[in-house]
């Protein structure tokens, strides 16, 4: 993506629509205003009603033009937005007219926001916040994205970076003014104190049980239990549709089937899994393996007991897990365990209560961390690596392995934290982040 190009794209929803917004950014904006707008380029931040023509003089539409001059724009470049009628023919003509001008091309996904990042208008976490707010479906997702877009994460990571930079300066003093090769205790003490403080804060951030990522991507709930206990029917009841195949044949479900719901104001992925049992069937055995993995990775497990089959109680039930006693409408062969929820997928008994229990769990989990520092897997990966480097730096100082080694470890940690917000070269990360944006953003 060459910065000298001028880019354009439809920034509003797909046609037909009442209004279409064509966004343009780059050095050719002034030429576009002069060539295509009947009234010329408007004054900065002033909307102008004008006729828009193509380079052959054919009328495209009558619309509103809004100009923002560099660096006072979203991208930091000269930008022009055209508000046109939202018919497909108008939009197609406008984009063809723009790209007919030398140096103007259609934008790639996320290219406007990438230019904003490259021009210092946003850092990488703020750019991710832009993508997240576009995709937000729940109030919790929107609030988290707005906080990130507003620099909430930047402030925290910049604080750590500033503290580490000061720590590195103290280590450099130790290197430049050694005391006969030993680390002076009065110099090492404040360095160790700084390192311990930052490490403690990072450990706290990493101990959030993935709340920020779950708010963004969705909480995971796995329905587990023996074959024919009614797991698929429970999924269908919760989904209010036939999401999973239901038969009387044990072992019908052989893969993980997921549905996406919004419960308790949070996105929740509920997975129906294969019945847990020993089997010689290769395909079913793979399904059981996947079921166990889904259960292990889930935030919450729904353990299903078949009330007509006195099978052993579920294994590995954690405190927050839910036990449901299915087929409560039939004559139970066993008594429901204490704390189990009696349900019937036939009559619907207990389904609403099960749904409310799931909603209560995800609501509690989402509110357990007031302001998550980690909202994506890449943030967690960098923090884990940064913490490892800081631990190595502390150990080097404590064991007298040398200030040089400690300094190098602190530099590594600083680089890891800086890469989260894009303060260092992260070209591979940029491609992954901005490729997920929509065209026009």
Swiss-Prot record:
InterPro entries: G_TrmE, GTP-bd, GTP-bd_TrmE_N, GTPase_MnmE, MnmE_dom2, MnmE_helical, P-loop_NTPase, Small_GTP-bd. Its EC number is 3.6.-.-. SUPFAM superfamilies: P-loop containing nucleoside triphosphate hydrolases, TrmE connector domain. Pfam families: MMR_HSR1, MnmE_helical, TrmE_N. GO terms for molecular function: GTP binding; GTPase activity; metal ion binding. (6S)-5-formyl-5,6,7,8-tetrahydrofolate binds at residues 23, 81, 121, 441. PROSITE patterns: G_TRME. GTP binds at residues 228-233, 247-253, 272-275, 326-329. Homodimer. Heterotetramer of two MnmE and two MnmG subunits. This is tRNA modification GTPase MnmE. It comes from Hyphomonas neptunium (strain ATCC 15444). The lineage of its organism: Bacteria, Pseudomonadati, Pseudomonadota, Alphaproteobacteria, Hyphomonadales. The gene is mnmE.
């Amino acid at each position: 993506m060459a910065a000298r190009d001028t880019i354009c794209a439809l920034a509003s929803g797909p046609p037909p629509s009442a209004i279409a917004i064509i966004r343009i950014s780059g050095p050719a904006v002034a030429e576009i205003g002069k060539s295509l707008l009947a009234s010329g380029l408007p004054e900065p931040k002033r909307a102008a009603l004008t006729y828009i023509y193509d380079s052959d003089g054919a009328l495209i539409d009558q619309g509103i033009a809004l100009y923002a001059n560099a660096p006072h724009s979203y991208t930091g470049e000269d930008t022009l937005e055209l508000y046109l009628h939202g018919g497909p023919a108008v939009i197609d003509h406008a984009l063809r007219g723009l790209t007919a001008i030398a140096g103007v091309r259609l934008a790639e996904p996320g290219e406007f926001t990438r230019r904003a990042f490259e021009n210092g208008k946003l850092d990488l976490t703020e750019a991710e916040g832009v993508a997240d707010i576009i995709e937000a479906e729940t109030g919790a997702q929107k609030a988290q994205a707005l906080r990130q877009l507003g620099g909430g994460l930047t402030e925290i990571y910049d604080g750590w970076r500033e503290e580490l930079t000061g720590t590195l300066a103290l280590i450099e003093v130790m290197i430049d003014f050694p005391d006969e090769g030993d680390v002076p205790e009065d110099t090492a003490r404040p360095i160790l104190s700084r390192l311990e403080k930052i490490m403690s804060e990072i450990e706290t951030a990493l101990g959030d049980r993935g709340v920020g990522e779950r708010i963004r991507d969705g909480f995971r709930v796995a329905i587990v239990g023996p074959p024919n206990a009614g797991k698929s029917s429970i999924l269908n009841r919760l989904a209010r549709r036939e999401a999973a195949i239901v038969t009387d044949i044990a072992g019908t479900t052989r893969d993980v089937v997921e549905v996406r719901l919004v419960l308790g104001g949070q996105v929740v992925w509920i997975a129906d899994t294969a019945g847990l049992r020993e089997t010689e069937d290769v395909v079913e055995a793979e399904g059981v393996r996947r079921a166990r993995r889904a259960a292990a990775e889930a935030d919450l497990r729904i353990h299903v007991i078949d009330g007509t089959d006195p099978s052993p109680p579920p294994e590995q039930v954690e405190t927050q897990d839910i036990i449901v006693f299915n087929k409560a409408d039939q004559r139970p062969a066993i008594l429901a365990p204490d704390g189990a929820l009696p349900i019937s997928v036939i009559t619907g008994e207990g389904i609403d209560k099960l749904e409310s229990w799931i909603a209560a769990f995800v609501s509690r989990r989402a509110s357990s961390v007031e302001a998550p520092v980690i909202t994506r897997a890449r943030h967690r990966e960098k923090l884990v690596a940064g913490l490892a480097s800081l631990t190595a730096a502390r150990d080097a100082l404590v064991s007298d392995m040398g200030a040089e080694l400690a300094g190098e470890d602190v530099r590594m940690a600083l680089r890891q934290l800086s890469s989260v917000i894009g303060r260092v070269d992260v070209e591979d990360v940029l491609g992954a982040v901005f490729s997920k944006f929509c065209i026009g953003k």
